[in-house]
Amino acid sequence: MASKATKTTQSKYAIINNQLRNDLPDFTSGDTIKVDVKIKEGEKFRIQTFEGLVIKTQGSGITYSVVVRKLSNGVFVERTFPLHSPIIDKVTIVKRGRVRRARIYYIRKLSGKAARIKEILPTKADKK
């Protein structure tokens, strides 16, 4: 017979698994992604796109989040997105990059051509 603590733990995990998204693509640091975010203005919602380089992924399960960095009007902007949040509408991969680190904070100090990341070109198997 299951104890009361076990039943509450099971129900907690059932609620969390209900809230997990299953439409997220598989991406890592160095990839360029496009995140569509729902913005509430008054009574209406609109979609705002944030496209940039993934410099960090963190957490697992419901706490999975990603830090995306982009150039906006000559200033670099970094934004953290909890990916299982209801304000995230869609995440798409623009291009894949090859880096040797999980957290590419060193990209903050680089500028110009030094800040480029080697692109991984899709193969025929990836297109299928």
Swiss-Prot record:
Coiled-coil stretches noted in the UniProt entry, renumbered to this chain: none
Keyword Ribonucleoprotein attributed: yes
SUPFAM superfamilies registered for this protein in UniProt: Translation proteins SH3-like domain
Keyword Metal-binding assigned: no
Task performed by this protein: This protein is located at the 30S-50S ribosomal subunit interface and may play a role in the structure and function of the aminoacyl-tRNA binding site.
One example of a Gene Ontology biological process annotation: translation
Molecular function via GO: structural constituent of ribosome
Primary gene name: rplS
Keywords: Ribonucleoprotein, Ribosomal protein
Highest taxon in the source lineage: Bacteria
The organism's taxonomic lineage, starting at the top: Bacteria, Bacillati, Mycoplasmatota, Mollicutes, Entomoplasmatales
The protein, known as: Large ribosomal subunit protein bL19
Family: Belongs to the bacterial ribosomal protein bL19 family.
Gene Ontology CC entries for this record: cytosolic large ribosomal subunit
Native species: Mesoplasma florum (strain ATCC 33453 / NBRC 100688 / NCTC 11704 / L1) (Acholeplasma florum)
